[in-house]
């Protein structure tokens, strides 16, 4: 997900630092982009690519400082991959230098599962399966069991190609525990995941 993108990371301080790094001023047109505002479906300009690289260098350096603090307390550092994570893209060339122990992300489909499970340079990956335990699903007219089954079917096939190390759910546990049959459904999901995980260890999918 990229709700705002690099265009939302501009500030007077950043522009000053970019000019020192790149050797030229960052112009408004590099963001306006002829009115397209650097949509993900646009080929970025050379100047915008420079800005992306600059931000990746800066953000990864800052992220490493935070990870080092976490490690100094003997804890693992895990990043949630989602919403707005510019600069720390796991497939970027500076990601490995952050030193994260793990990455967790929301699994909406087989595509997003692979985006998480294929990440290199971390000790393990985790998928947050759907639905979230929120009132918009666990309500009159909602179908959390159906959503859980549908999400698992989409994720399961991708899991066979590139397994996650862990799965989980998020939200208000009381909503899940009070919904008839939901915990039983999740138990089935967890059992299947464990079987796949055990059978896939060290075994190529093709």
Where are these regions (language model features)?
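Carbohydrate-binding surfaces of carbohydrate-active enzymes
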Residues: 71-73, 109-122, 126-133, 139-206
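General secondary-structure edge motif
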Residues: 50, 138-139
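Polysaccharide-binding and catalytic clefts of secreted carbohydrate-active enzymes
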Residues: 1-100, 106-109, 115
């Amino acid at each position: 997900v990229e709700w705002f993108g690099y265009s939302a990371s501009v500030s007077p301080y950043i522009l000053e630092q970019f000019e020192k790094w790149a050797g030229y001023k960052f112009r408004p047109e590099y963001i306006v982009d002829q009115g397209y505002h650097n949509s993900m479906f646009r080929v970025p300009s050379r100047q915008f690519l420079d800005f992306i690289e600059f931000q990746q260098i800066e953000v990864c350096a800052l992220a490493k400082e935070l990870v080092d603090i976490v490690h100094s307390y003997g804890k693992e550092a895990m990043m949630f991959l989602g919403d707005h994570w510019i600069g720390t893209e796991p497939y970027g060339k500076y990601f490995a230098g952050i030193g994260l122990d793990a990455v967790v992300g929301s699994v909406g489909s087989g595509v997003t599962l692979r985006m998480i499970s294929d990440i290199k340079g971390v000790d393990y990956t985790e998928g947050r399966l759907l639905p979230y335990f929120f009132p918009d699903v666990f309500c009159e007219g909602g179908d959390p069991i159906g959503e859980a089954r549908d999400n698992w079917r989409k994720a399961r096939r991708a899991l066979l190609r590139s397994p996650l190390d862990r799965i989980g759910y998020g939200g208000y546990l009381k909503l899940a525990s009070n919904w008839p049959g939901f915990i039983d459904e999740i138990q089935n999901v967890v059992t299947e995941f464990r079987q796949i995980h055990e059978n896939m260890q060290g075994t190529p999918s093709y």
